[in-house]
Amino acid sequence: MKERIKGRKNFPTDEVDPENFLSDDDVRNLIKDKDNITFEQNDYYKLYNCVHCGECETEEERLLLKQKFLEDGNKVDGLEDMIECFRKYRTPYPSNKMRIRRPEGIPDESDTLFYMGCLSTIRIPRYTERSLKYLLNQKVDFTILEKEICCGWPWFASGCNEEFEICKKENIEIFEEFKTVICLCPACYFLFNKYYKPSMKSTTEFKYISDYLKPSDIKKSGKVGVQHLCQLMNRGRKGVDKRVNNILSKSGYEVVEIPHWCCGGGLGYMHRTDVIEKVANKRMSDFDKAGGDYSTTYCPSCWWILARYSKLCKISPKAKDLFELLI
């Protein structure tokens, strides 16, 4: 596999945590022999090394190995607390209260639902408010829910199949009432299309918010580096990076070329946070080296990483989400 960044491995966790990295062949061999294996607590470091960027060919098999790790009686720090929050609030957080301020102009009823996600509405509300304002500015007809149920990604990516199935069942009952569901988060978009749709009675269409992006009507300027989305590009949406870059260029920005690499946020900030931080720090160095005025993205998890680590790493480009750059 050709290196996209000279001297760096394409698989992010192989780059930052090579002693615990499992290759595709390693994973396939474990799957073949899993009925004869009993995982021990120390296997956590290898099995939860993955940040779920979708770069490898064995993402689903890695999830099965996590399920077996838990079934074998092992523990993951913080997971029980997350599950308790889920039982109470249907989110991985100790609340299901949205922290967003609902902009005027969103109708109470529509055949299109904008599903924002737990991270977006609870942890990064300003990012989410700007996405709402952007859709309103584009005259998109949509509504939002008073409260959302987690899409299931934290449980799916942790190996907790029971909790994921609950999310799936309860959300399907809601989504079947809509013709279209616009997703703000690529993990939600992935789960809804691949795992929800086959179980749905309706013909609900799931779209990603990048499908609604257009060049700004106001002429913009400045150099922009973009963190494109592993969870779209590695899961069947090749070309979205070129489309977004083209929109920025037509808006007046100069797009700074930065070879694609994971930001570390694909899993969310949980479990092997030491690995996530190492990946994030390396990615911030890419933006700093490339220079420019702004660093941007159109993924909530990437934005959480970019907003946080651009400050911690004191990189030169200022972090601004794509909606802010285009409004």
Regions found by a protein language model. Give the residues of each.
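Fold-independent oxyanion-binding glycine-rich loops
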Residues: 117-118, 209-210, 229, 322-323
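A short, charged/proline- and glycine-enriched loop
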Residues: 107-112, 218-224
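Catalytic cores of enzyme domains
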Residues: 4-6, 207, 212-215, 223-236, ...
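Iron-sulfur-cluster electron-transfer modules
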Residues: 8-190, 195-200
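Cofactor-cradling patches in redox/metallo enzymes
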Residues: 119-204, 233-239, 245-327
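N-terminal glycine-rich, Lys/His-bearing helix-loop that initiates the first secondary-structure elements
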Residues: 1
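Short, structured interface segments
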Residues: 66-69, 202-214
